[in-house]
Design a protein with these regions (language model features):
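Short amphipathic, helix-prone segments within low-complexity/disordered or flexible regions
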Residues: 2-6, 16-20, 24-27
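Generic low-complexity, intrinsically disordered sequence content enriched
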Residues: 7-8, 254
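Polybasic, lysine-rich low-complexity intrinsically disordered segments
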Residues: 9-13
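Extended, histidine- and acidic-residue-enriched regions that form the cofactor-binding/catalytic faces
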Residues: 27-273
Length: 273
């Protein structure tokens, strides 16, 4: 995963004063620690993968605004954290040979256009990317599962997985979901980031956004995107977020994805149910 770094502001509050450092920058050990998993595609060799027919788990995220307090790659970080933990859990159960792929870090984020930093490749391009990724990887991987961290990617994932399955490839996908989660850059995502990347949360910039139900906001968002309903780019309330809550939410996401992958019952669009 390619991470985006920005100059630190002097006024920024530190969440983890005793975190280890890389150079002069504090690093969160929880995010950078490599959880035990069978292997990672980026550090494997072709010879190691020969004749093993591994199952491949691929995080899918985005580069988009997450309010004034969260990094642009928030969705990718969450998808990667969930995918890594799921791969480790499945490996512990000896459920196939799982390999964690580098994240697909760009997604369909058109609703966030107009906010600086957002880079959206759109649904059509993402669909094509996922299809070609799947066609290539399926030549040596026995199964493909995309772990999605951004709601705007679901249309592309559904179309791509449906085509891959029609072509005879064993592909599926699931999203990082939690019960009663708010929509964007609010309590849910901020809590998870406080757990996995505390030094990259600008806690002094946290402000409550629009907390209306997403169903009520959608008519305006279809016309003008997130900016039409929240000047901050926040849908929810990040001021209530805690690292402890983030740990619980992440575990819930991992549990849900693990169950769906273990059960492996894809619907007509390849979504695991």
């Amino acid at each position: 995963m390619v991470r985006l770094w920005f100059p630190m502001k002097k006024s920024r509050k530190s969440i983890a004063a005793h975190a280890p450092t890389i150079g002069a920058r504090q690093v969160n050990s929880a995010y950078h620690r490599r959880v035990a998993s069978p292997s990672e595609l980026s550090t494997s060799t072709s010879r190691q993968l020969q004749r093993t027919s591994p199952a491949l788990i691929i995080p899918v995220g985005s580069v988009e605004q997450h309010g004034p307090h969260l990094p642009l790659d928030t969705d990718t970080r969450i998808a990667t954290a969930v995918a890594r933990s799921v791969a480790a859990r499945l490996a512990d159960r000896n459920e196939s040979n799982w390999v964690l792929a580098p994240a697909i870090g760009y997604g369909a984020s058109g609703e966030h256009e107009g906010f600086a930093g957002t880079v959206s490749i759109g649904t059509s391009a993402l669909r094509l990317l996922l299809v070609e990724f799947g066609r290539s990887a399926a030549q040596w991987a026995s199964r493909l599962v995309f772990v999605n961290g951004h709601g705007g990617n679901t249309e592309a994932l559904a179309a791509a997985a449906a085509l891959l399955r029609y072509e005879g490839r064993d592909a599926g996908w699931c999203s990082c979901t939690a019960e009663n989660a708010d929509a964007h850059a609010g309590h849910t995502e901020t809590s998870v980031l406080l757990h996995i990347s505390p030094t990259d949360v600008w806690v002094d910039e946290c402000l409550a956004g629009n907390s209306a139900p997403l169903s009520k906001l959608m008519p305006q968002m279809r016309q003008g995107g997130v900016a039409a309903v929240s000047e901050l780019g926040v849908l929810g309330d990040p001021t209530t977020a805690t690292a402890q809550e983030g740990e619980r939410i992440l575990a819930e996401m991992v549990d849900a994805c693990s169950r769906r992958i273990t059960r492996w019952v894809p619907d007509r669009d390849g979504m695991l149910t």
